[in-house]
Amino acid sequence: MSKSAVSPMMQQYLGIKAQHTDKLVFYRMGDFYEMFFDDAVEAAKLLDITLTTRGQVDGEPVKMAGVPFHAAEQYLARLVKLGKSVAICEQVGEVGAGKGPVERKVVRIVTPGTLTDSALLEDKETNRIVAVSPDKKYIGLAWASLQSGEFKTKLTTVDKLDDELARLQAAEILLPDSKNAPQLQTASGVTRLNAWQFAADAGEKLLTEYFGCQDLRGFGLDGKEHAVAIGAAGALLNYIRLTQNLMPQHLDGLSLETDSQYIGMDAATRRNLEITQTLSGKKSPTLMSTLDLCATHMGSRLLALWLHHPLRNRAHIRARQEAVAALESQYKPLQCRLKSIADIERIAARIAVGNARPRDLAALRDSLFALSEIELSAECSSLLGTLKAVFPENLSTAEQLRQAILPEPSVWLKDGNVINHGFHPELDELRRIQNHGDEFLLDLEAKERERTGLSTLKVEFNRVHGFYIELSKTQAEQAPADYQRRQTLKNAERFITPELKAFEDKVLTAQEQALALEKQLFDGVLKNLQTALPQLQKAAKAAAALDVLSTFSALAKERNFVRPEFADYPVIHIENGRHPVVEQQVRHFTANHTDLDHKHRLMLLTGPNMGGKSTYMRQVALIVLLAHTGCFVPADAATIGPIDQIFTRIGASDDLASNRSTFMVEMSETAYILHHATEQSLVLMDEVGRGTSTFDGLALAHAVAEHLLQKNKSFSLFATHYFELTYLPEAHTAAVNMHLSALEQGQDIVFLHQIQPGPAGKSYGIAVAKLAGLPVRALKSAQKHLNGLENQAAANRPQLDIFSTMPSEKGDEPNVGNFVDKAEEKHFEGILAAALEKLDPDSLTPREALSELYRLKDLCKSVS
């Protein structure tokens, strides 16, 4: 493309676009942001806006699409959600100031991970950007949130990278554009940077300059040991500087995070427990949506953070528990007060990057005054006392804002009426000139009528022609000589006089000067607030923590959550535990006990489909998770020993992108658990071995259960439909059989959802199929085949003895030749017990009793 063949304006655009080839360029032209060439085509498709043309280049029409300046935020939000980055190119020069096009430059770059504008952000979600820097042994992670000032780093490994990214919920991921960059499960939101930007030396230099220190040891970072983490942090800080066109002043130090701080949860566990997103990708009903009674958006974001980061430090947990207990009698007035608090965290972020608006400062002022008035009773905990002590520290800032900003300023600075009266004498004088113009006009009108004797004379103003004197057509010819004609109308003439012209110049000049002065003063206020940013961030964090703790108190009081106890020995004891989400969705929820300790580490859970096995297992995990956030738990009582990780293998689907079947996904998740679970881990395993042949599945399920018992020794809830596994407690005393009960009523089934000792009597699969609406013919066929299979199994037991030839690890033959016999015996006992349990001898007639006796005899024949 020849530059001589394009206009000066298009040459300017092409020069700017050449510096941002990987981004859409919003090029400001008057009241629109325009896009050209391929940007226009892509934007028109993504935003569903009109694609048009403007002029030609090399004989071809130039594609063009645009969005209005005043509505740009909604379009930016849509592009960012699609993972696009946008360079905002503004007019920075004066129109007509010189030859050629108006001077323009890119003032900021909007990317998914560097947003600060509230219109582009979800109120209750933290927006993070993560940098990933690999070497041969470790992967360095660094992440930041421009909204909160969070800035952290960590060393991890390749096999844990996707789990870390799931925990951080990154909106944008920075990767080196090199061959050794790790492969991620997701490609969305990934930005490739030159590999040299991740160099540790350059990173350390940038970080030490930013924090004003000689080295990074004070942050727990050693130059050699943490080289990749330092490289990631340096690349991240430099990226933020480039996109924001300035170095942010509000990043809250740099801290090194370790695995020992939080209970570990891999990506599958976070997904299966539906902490902040359902399995179908929705935001409700989840643990977060169910517990979120927060009064502020800051509190909601912190609650999500706590749920994804359950603590291991018992002292910190107990401090939160004490605060929750102290607030139980005063959380209602506290939450009422907190509802008036604006999003201080995000306002501080906008101040830091220089794009705060007038009403941001007004909301900040009002919020700081409101926080200083929060009162807590004398019995408050030490944590509450620490949080409350932060608020008075910002009173001087609130007072400065009260003096500087009008009580209700304009939305936009360009409209004026932002700076308070009395803040600046010159501004007050300019406003007086503007605001007292009406008095001058009335006086002038009265004086001119008296001087000329013209009764139709009026002095008025409009935006097109400014100030003027209007006379009717009949009196216009009598106008004095000093009246200069300005406009002719059908029934009137408009004039200007030297006196009125002088006043007009004075008013218009005053208006321009006032707007310019207000902008100057507002920028000065923003600059002064930069020094207050650390205190503002402390206030935001304290208010958010107070909000979450008061929410925990509300849950304890209104939903009967109890304070869990912590033990130093291995135990998970829960009395009448409830699923915190499900109990809010149903009228009646059946509470259940859980007892695991050093003697009983694996609960073998059997029972019918729809019986509640998965709900029960998730319930136990969520109670353990909640206890480690400092929240009280949905139970009558709970005692929990040391927990380091929570693992789940509950349900799965094909991973088509990686060409992995459902069974492969399940086995991969199972393998990860067996490799990483420890004696202090909680493991949930649901129907291991399904998706392959019966014998393969049974063999795998048996092997996994044994591995958990003998090698991992984790606390495990192991749900299965393989009744043959219920022999395990006889071979392993650390295993215990439990089942979810059900009751047959004629041809119908009632799920009791009650955990009871022993194995289940049967699986009730056909009964569940009936509930699902299978045709009667199919149900009858299924029952017929089931009866045949059961009879065949009973007549040919040896064919099911699949473990009789399995060598043990020591090489000797295990004594499990009677494995199936024992399993079937237990199966029969369960069926018989269930049948007897239903009977009420006192209510049976003699004929009914005899009929039941024959039915039981037939039952014995069919199973024996």
Curated annotation (Swiss-Prot):
Keyword DNA repair tagged: yes
One cellular-component annotation, GO: cytosol
Gene3D superfamilies: 1.10.1420.10, 6.10.140.430, DNA repair protein MutS, domain I, MutS, connector domain, P-loop containing nucleotide triphosphate hydrolases
Gene symbol of the encoding locus: mutS
Family classification: Belongs to the DNA mismatch repair MutS family.
Residues that hold ATP according to the record: G607, P608, N609, M610, G611, G612, K613, S614
Regions that span the bilayer: none
Keywords: ATP-binding, DNA damage, DNA repair, DNA-binding, Nucleotide-binding
PROSITE patterns, per the entry: DNA_MISMATCH_REPAIR_2
Name of the featured protein: DNA mismatch repair protein MutS
